[in-house]
Every structure is written in structure tokens, then in C-alpha cells.
């Protein structure tokens, strides 16, 4: 089993990069952030307060989260892959991920899903918490304005009307929450390779991460 951990803040491009790197290496791809977004979505729809740890943990435990072969996320039989990709659900994910019980439950599930498979797993605490012994650790980052522009472009591509100033404000608040939470905060693992991607194209970032993986674990 080889784990390639791709961590970084919102808008750093880790989802797209990790998915393409996994395809290039022939590895499985797993988006851990989607799981927290799904729990946030289900809690919001159920009217559960996002800081009510006991209720959110119970909801997460019964959610039946699973990925299909195309990487789409289901809660039971419902495909929630598109519904979770909003600024609101990003903020909800940040709040529920700070709850120790929720994080503990989902980290356990992420390790179970990985099994003994070669996998590219992306999130905010893969290299520091989920798989601290990962063979490859990469931390992607970029300037806040660049990350906000990327996130706004993603939302517009879905047909959403967005104000880039509001996207930037939400991004900075997400950074604050994720980096200051008591449990598994967002930070670069000491042995991770950091890539500042502000001036890089997507193809360049994918090639760089795939190259790092190949050098560290072989072709």
C-alpha cells in the first residue's frame, strides 16, 4: 500500500490535482473533504446545529457515506456530489470538521476506505493525522487572491453567480477556522514537499506532484 497525501487550504487546487495524479499513477483517488461537506449538508438539511457534536456524530454515523467507481459521493442512495460544492457547504464542513467526534469517526472511515490500496488522498490533515506515515506528502498552497479566483471560477463553471470579494472573505475565514481548530488543524507536515502554485498551470502542478511521487516510491 502506497499513500500519496495531498494537503492544502481551500482553493489550492488539491482536488483536481490529486484526481489527475491518481489517474496518472494508476492509484485510487479519495477526496476526504467531500465527506465533511456531506455531513455538513445533511446536518443543515436536518436542522441540526453544526456545533451540536452528539447529534452531528450520530448523523455522520448513520449517513452511509460511500464513493462509487467514478469518485462520486453518496449518502445512502443519494448522490450528494454536486450539492456539497457550495460556499455554504464549505463553511459547514469547516465547522463540523472541528468537532473531535466527527473527525475521529471520519478519519477511521477514511483509513478503512483506503484499505491496502495504492491511493492518492487529499484533504487538510492527511499527512499529519490520517496517514502520518504516508510515503509521499505534498502540501499545495497559493496566494489568497489566486485561490479565491480559482474557487470563483469553479463556482461560475457550475452556473453560480459569485462575487469574488465574498469568495475571498469566505476563504480567509475558512483558513482561520481550519488552521486554529483544536483537533488536527490545517498545517504542513514537517516532511511534506510544499508547492507554491500561484504562478503554475494545472498541468505543471500535476506534473510536479506526479514527479515527486515517482521519485519517492518509484514508477
What are these regions (language model features)?
Residues 4-6:
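Hydrophobic anchor at the beta1->P-loop junction of P-loop NTPases
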Residues 14:
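Conserved lysine of the Walker
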Residues 17:
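Hydrophobic positions on the alpha1 helix immediately C-terminal to the Walker A/P-loop
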Residues 81-160:
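ATP-dependent NMP and nucleoside kinases share a basic, alpha-helical "lid"
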Residues 9:
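P-loop (Walker A) phosphate-binding loop of NTP-binding proteins
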Residues 137-146, 151-154, 194, 201, ...:
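Glycine-rich phosphate-binding loops of nucleotide-dependent enzymes
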Residues 23-87:
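N-terminal phosphate/diphosphate-binding loop that engages ATP/GTP or pyrophosphate donors
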Residues 110-116, 124-129, 133, 158-208:
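Small-molecule kinase domains that catalyze NTP-dependent phosphoryl transfer to phosphate-bearing small molecules
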